[in-house]
Amino acid sequence: GPCPEGSGVADRATCATFTVPKDYDDPSSGTIELTMSKIPASGQKKGVVAGNPGGPGGDALGMFSDPSDKGEGSQAVHLPESVGKNYDLIAVEPRGLTWGTPLNCEPEIATPYMTAGMLYGACESHNPGYTKTVNTENTARDLEEARKLLGEKQLNLYGLSYGGPLMSTYATLFPEHTNKAIFDSSASPNDLVFRLAEKRQAIRHEAIHEFFSWV
């Protein structure tokens, strides 16, 4: 069907909403909704390319331009026209984002600042148990659910930036359903986001102390 308004998809793209387990380790936890976009192959279809633009948490629905537009679209990834002739291009919106069951982290009481613990508590207050499931492994498992829905035996993977570790996680979990993989400007799986944030926080802390000692 049609894609959500404002999702930035290519003109020929269509979208579908589907449900997945909220917590794959706990079937009793219920389900969440996700949205997937697809640009169908313009010629004889040979398979499917599944993409993720990185982030983590980057909006994925509109990541692919339509290869038949010869790179004229405003989307982030422009693949060769030959790819668009032979492959459907799909992207699953990562769990927790707008075009699905969103992770609502608005605090009940407005505050000028929030610690990580306060933010986590706000997220949990709206959908208990959901926050901990928004991770790389579950996002990869969500892609596997999309593959099943499409009825495809294998997926070709395209991961940009953090999408590289995400797609490599999928390939590790589901090697029998992985064909070819491209990791474009891939982030290192050793430099996890929180570790990077900790490094940046330490640098900021040092810089602030140097500034005030100078003042």
Model-identified regions with their sequence ranges:
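Gly/Pro-rich cap/lid or specificity-loop segments adjacent to the active site
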Residues: 1-215
